[in-house]
Design a protein with these regions (language model features):
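Mature, function-bearing regions of proteins
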Residues: 2-3, 8-10, 18-360
């Protein structure tokens, strides 16, 4: 991805802001005024001001979009540590993960279940805005003060958009590195689609760059001036104690220990190859010309292998169901595919409103 030098400074507002469609009561001065619903207009702070929380009804993406082609592909798992670490490098987002997330207790289930609602914001068709609001509202109560005394709130528009920006750039990475590449026109189309995608959440559009060129400036500014080498980002990259994935539960612990060491080193290397140079420097990694050549050859191998996989089976179940509805394979009103029970939060967390926890 072409990166330009940042021009005007891009601020990271730390004011507490929540969308108007959220109605949970909150008594914290971090989230809002005492005794007011956090959806109260006085707390909107630039969020959309229509009663539904949207400036105009959002139009979901469909099968004619490039986002449907590249997002929800299992190859996206290869950039998972990149996306997680990039998100957590944002100081507010990293603090929220450190203080509130169950990621450190349940790495695999937390990752695998989150793919369902995240994918649904793209692939749920007419129901995508509802899914987007659900995803947004999981974050209502996630707030606090970090170790440096800085306030954070997960629904700060700058923070929420940063997470979405990593989804967009992650989609570019998947297409560029593992799917054969993109033209400049396709990058611009994906940029426009990521804006349409973001509207599904009913969040303020204030932080969203207006053009592809402005987004490149925004991304460069974030990488150079905002992101931090923090505990939450390093924890994503620490794969030395990675538990067995669900499909390998029958593998004895002693047998898993050996490949885990190799996989840990490989996935860190794969992740570093996707970082922008300022992020590599921030996190203390070197990247040689030989590394770049090997990284691209690995991407070529992935592309060739996936060419042998039928299209439907390249897709996550939520994405596959979206395609099946669009092509008439299943009814348009078929129930949305939910995460299996093995991915549910720990029993003591299942009543926590910050978790996606379907009845399965």
């Amino acid at each position: 991805m072409k990166i330009q030098q940042a021009k005007p400074p891009v601020t990271q507002d730390t004011s507490a802001t929540c969308p108007l469609t959220s109605t949970v009561q909150d008594s914290s001065p971090v989230a809002g005024q005492l005794g007011r619903p956090i959806g109260f207009r006085g707390l909107a702070g630039g969020c959309p001001v229509s009663p539904q929380g949207y400036e105009s009804p959002p139009l979901p993406l469909g099968p004619d979009s490039l986002t449907w082609r590249y997002f929800g592909d299992w190859r996206g798992m290869l950039q998972g540590p990149w996306a997680g670490s990039m998100q957590n490098m944002h100081p507010q987002l990293g603090a929220a993960v450190e203080d509130h997330s169950t990621f450190f207790r349940e790495r695999w289930p937390r990752l695998l279940r989150s793919l369902y609602p995240i994918g649904g914001v793209v692939f749920d068709g007419d129901r995508a805005p509802v899914t987007g609001v659900q995803v947004r509202d999981y974050h209502i109560t996630i707030k606090g003060v970090d170790g440096a005394g800085r306030r954070y709130h997960a629904l700060n528009p700058d923070v929420f958009y940063w997470a979405h920006a990593t989804f967009f750039v992650g989609t570019l990475h998947v297409a560029e590195r593992f799917c054969g590449g993109l033209t400049e026109a396709q990058r611009r189309q994906l940029f426009d689609e990521h804006v349409q995608w973001y509207r599904m959440y009913g969040m303020s559009m204030r932080p969203v760059p207006a053009t592809w060129e402005e987004f490149q400036d925004y991304w460069d500014h974030m990488c150079r001036n905002v992101l931090e080498n923090n505990f939450a980002a390093r924890a994503v990259l620490d794969l030395t104690e990675l538990p067995k994935p669900p499909f390998a539960q029958r593998v004895p612990d002693w047998l898993w220990a050996a490949p885990r060491k190799l996989l840990a080193r490989f996935f860190v290397w794969l992740t570093v190859g996707l970082y922008d140079p300022p992020v590599r420097e921030l996190m203390g990694y070197r990247w040689l010309r030989r590394d770049e050549w090997l990284h691209r050859r690995f991407g070529d191998i992935v592309r060739l292998v996936f060419a042998l996989v039928p299209f439907r089976f390249r897709k996550h179940p939520r994405a596959r169901a979206g395609w099946d509805r669009a092509t008439g394979r299943i009814p348009a009103d078929a129930p949305l595919v939910q995460t299996p029970a093995r991915n549910l939060p720990p029993p003591d967390e299942r009543d926590n409103p910050t978790h996606y926890c379907p009845k399965v």
